[in-house]
């Protein structure tokens, strides 16, 4: 019975096949007729080379992300010692052996490879190992891996946000999403994505709780979605709706191939609650924690030194920024500019501040859009366009009445939409002591609505092609 042994991956850094390849190259460069030597049969094929019985583990390289079957330098030394002991000749260590820096830090399963069949079987596990490591690197916010994912121009990035009740953290009050299909856009010659035109987005309010359950400690703003019309959805149908959005963007599940979908989150709390809601995510989907990614960028000095928008003090290492405060750091003069860091022009800074002020936080739709937009700014701030926001015209009140046959409606109502109920802002309430507001009284010099009750609700200037 074979024994199961775990070893520390530190020191296991020499690709086994590269050891054999390096020796064949060394013999050729130095004109060594190895095939005429008494020990030459050890190098006649890779299978003969494996007969030495090599101790190996599988790891992934921390820089390239590729998976390798690696051995230790001491094992190479033992092979050279065996040749000298048996055949009386000293074979030097070959140069140019591929060295790997293991990404894994936990113990690995030690295996003994003695023939090509064992090596081939172990080699077949490398794609799954590489995928598992890549998912871990992206989830941890490793900048190199995340930048590679973005530069592939073939993934779909989906940002989601939930607003939960403060009284019952299992009650979802709102859900919003924003997505960009990079592969689709790149095939149309559109790169980088233009947030205002290329983001697919939506905002849903749970009908059972609308205007009934309201958070007090962290006030939410369900009626102030800035990028379109909100929709009312029942509590029982929300998981089905979310599942349909994910299914429309994801590729098939696989143990060896990464999914085309990358889910953006800000922390991992919502993912756990999605499981409780019965929402299944394919195992090969990548999860990118934007907060961890930004913290890593700041820790390594890529973002320079800055003021924390929350405290107005120099930012401390390890601190986490909310999506809107993350965007504010792009609109503030940095305390120190890092090498290669892009700083927005004053005009773009003013445009970004206007966008942030027009999109109230703790609205699930706004937060999802800002999460995706802030992540794109971290990845490509120099070429990312800032969305232009203008006040949204007031619409009809929410209607939850069931759809009726068109023939049974009066002629004056045949133009009504039969789609899902749209939740635009309720009519503005007039104060008991105030006079009727004229339209010009509702617009300030900065083109924003006065904050009267829930009536302030900015919207997007123009719609475009979704990615």
Language-model region placement:
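Generic structural signal of hydrophobic/aromatic residues within well-ordered alpha-helices
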Residues: 23, 46, 79, 83, ...
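Metal-dependent phosphoesterase core characteristic of DEDDh/y 3'-5' exonuclease domains
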Residues: 2-115, 187, 195-200, 205-214, ...
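Glycine- and small hydrophobic-enriched segments that form the cores of compact globular domains
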Residues: 150-160, 164-257, 263
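Extreme C-terminal disordered tails of eukaryotic proteins encode short linear targeting/docking signals used
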Residues: 413-467
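Entry/capping segment at the start of metal-dependent catalytic domains
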Residues: 91-189
């Amino acid at each position: 019975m074979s024994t199961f042994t775990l070893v520390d991956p530190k020191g296991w850094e020499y690709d086994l096949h590269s050891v054999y390849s390096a020796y064949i190259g060394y013999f050729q460069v130095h004109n060594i007729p190895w095939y005429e030597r008494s020990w030459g049969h050890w190098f006649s094929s890779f299978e003969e080379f494996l007969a030495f019985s090599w101790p190996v583990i599988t790891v992934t390289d921390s820089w390239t992300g590729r998976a390798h079957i690696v051995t230790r330098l001491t094992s190479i030394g033992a092979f050279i010692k065996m040749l000298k002991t048996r055949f009386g000749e000293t074979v030097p260590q070959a140069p140019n052996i591929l060295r790997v820096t293991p990404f894994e830090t936990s113990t690995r399963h030690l295996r003994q490879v003695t023939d090509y069949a064992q090596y081939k079987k172990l080699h077949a596990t490398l794609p799954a190992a590489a995928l598992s490591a890549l998912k871990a690197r992206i989830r941890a916010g490793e900048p190199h891996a995340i930048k590679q994912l973005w530069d592939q121009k073939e993934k779909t990035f989906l940002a989601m946000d939930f607003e939960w009740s403060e009284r019952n953290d299992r009650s979802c009050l709102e859900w919003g999403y924003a997505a960009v299909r990079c592969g689709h856009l790149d095939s149309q010659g559109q790169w980088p994505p233009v947030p205002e035109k290329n983001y697919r987005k939506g905002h849903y309010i749970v009908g059972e709780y609308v205007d009934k359950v309201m958070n007090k400690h962290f006030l939410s703003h369900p009626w102030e979605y800035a990028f379109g019309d909100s929709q009312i959805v029942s509590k029982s149908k929300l998981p089905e709706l979310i599942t349909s959005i994910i299914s429309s963007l994801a590729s098939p599940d696989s143990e060896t191939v990464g999914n085309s979908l990358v889910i953006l989150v800000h922390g991992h709390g919502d993912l756990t609650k999605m499981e409780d809601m019965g929402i299944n995510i394919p195992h090969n989907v990548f999860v990118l924690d934007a907060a961890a990614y930004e913290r890593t960028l700041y820790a390594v000095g890529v973002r320079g030194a800055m003021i924390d928008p929350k405290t107005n003090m120099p930012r401390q290492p390890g601190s986490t920024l909310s999506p809107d405060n993350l965007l504010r750091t792009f609109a503030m003069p940095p305390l120190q500019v890092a090498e290669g860091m892009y700083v927005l022009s004053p005009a773009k800074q003013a445009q970004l501040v206007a966008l942030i002020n027009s999109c109230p936080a703790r609205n699930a739709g706004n937060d999802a859009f800002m999460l995706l937009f802030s992540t794109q700014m971290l990845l490509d701030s120099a070429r990312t366009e800032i969305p232009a926001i203008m006040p949204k015209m007031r619409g009809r009140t929410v209607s939850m009445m069931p759809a009726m046959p068109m023939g049974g409606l009066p002629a004056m109502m045949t133009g009504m939409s039969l789609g899902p109920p749209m939740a635009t802002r309720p009519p503005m309430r007039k104060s008991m002591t105030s006079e009727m507001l004229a339209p010009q009284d509702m617009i300030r010099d900065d083109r924003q609505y006065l904050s009267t009750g829930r009536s302030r609700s900015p919207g997007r200037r123009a719609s475009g092609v979704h990615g």
